[in-house]
Design a protein with these regions (language model features):
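Conserved hydrophobic "DFG−1" position in protein kinase catalytic cores
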Residues: 11-12, 19, 85-87, 103
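Generic C-terminal helix-cap and adjacent flexible tail
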Residues: 1, 126-131
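NUDIX/MutT-family hydrolases
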Residues: 84, 94-125
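A conserved beta-turn-beta hairpin within the catalytic core of GNAT-like acetyltransferases
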Residues: 26-30
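Conserved N-terminal beta-strand and adjoining loop/helix that marks the start
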Residues: 1-17, 37
Length: 131
């Protein structure tokens, strides 16, 4: 089975995390943490900065690795490095690829339909509840 390596940013602000709704592809309308594929020769930290700039036109400060999720979708295996992140000072997000976005508190985190691999991340966030 093909493995796809991706990164995701768990962007925190005012005790909320940022979630995006996919606007394209097989998983259209599913909710996820923003991010994308790691390019050959690229570090995960560099990839997440690049992806957030491409998807949200925003600059972020990458924090600690929260977790790496290994998930088997029907046609591929996903390996997803998930990093805590914050918006850089004076940076604002604009949706360039996603259909919608929300800031979610811990009480609201289960109100969206998360993609399967992101469900694993949500479980860890709820267990740690440290954002």
């Amino acid at each position: 089975m093909k493995t796809i390596r991706v990164v995701a940013a768990i962007i925190r602000k005012d005790n909320k995390i940022f979630a995006t709704q996919r606007g394209y592809g097989d998983f259209k309308d599913g909710w996820e943490f923003p991010g994308g594929k790691i390019e050959e020769g690229e570090s995960p930290e560099h990839a997440i900065v690049r992806e957030i700039k491409e998807e949200l036109n925003a600059d972020i400060i990458v924090g600690d690795l929260l977790t790496t999720v290994e998930y088997d979708y029907p046609n591929f295996h996903l390996s997803m490095d998930c990093f805590w992140a914050e918006l850089a000072p004076d940076s604002h997000m604009k949706l360039l690829e996603h259909e919608a976005a929300k800031w979610l508190s811990i009480d609201e985190i289960d109100t969206v339909d998360w993609l399967p691999a992101d469900v694993e991340v949500v479980k860890i966030i709820k267990e740690r509840h440290n954002y």
